[in-house]
Amino acid sequence: MKLKLNFLPYFSFIPKKLNTNSIIFKIIKVFFIAILLSNSIYLSFFENIFTQTISPFLAIWGLVLLLKSKNSKQYFWIGFFVGILWFWWIGLSSIYFNLNYLVPIIPIIIGFIYGLLFRLCYLLKFDFLRLCGIFCISFIHPLGFDWLNWGIFTVYGFFDPSYRGIICIFLIAYFIYEGYISRYYKIAIVLILFFSGFQYNEKQAQTLNLNYKLINTNISQNQKFLQENLKSNSDILIQDILQAINEKKELVILPETA
């Protein structure tokens, strides 16, 4: 007889008397999963060896719990909260266009979009295909912006910051979740995937072999987008570019929103 391997005591810290069918518990559960899938973003504020070590494993835990979600509503709300936790900051730029009311609306819209994408992934019949669908969401790049990039799972920890590391993280989560494999086979598969995705060599920084100039405008954000300042700000940038040309610079790098 094959034995199921229980790697994680999932929600064993929840008191037994708590009604797990209550709406409050379900909201807490999907939000907790979304936090696990977003942990790399927020643990970056507390950089130390401990947080860097556990970060990818928290992401794996989040993927396992996502697979354990057995209805499309849970997938939707996990995607909804992931969208908000990853992109809440996008709405802040509307402040500088006197559109303050859009600050909460924009992340909610983004949350609904990712909620729908996660829900579409649930429509796939098998759990492995659902996980593949979640993985493929990272290839959706509207407006040329690299949105939900699962590569963030490999920013910290032992896994190689490449598709090899990312794929191994997803596969580890799947085989931990999978209940039809015996304990010892499961341990062996997970270990093989771990060492397959391991980063063995430190990545060397690549430098530009160009004579470039980095321009820092030092213009405050609340002044940059005012209509009356557009011409003066543009004139400053043009002067900096012309000066760089006179200095025989091959490349001029401007601030992102210059």
Residue ranges and their predicted role:
Residues 2-198:
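Membrane-embedded alpha-helical bundles of multi-pass enzymes
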Residues 202-258:
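Soluble catalytic regions of membrane-associated enzymes that act on cell-envelope
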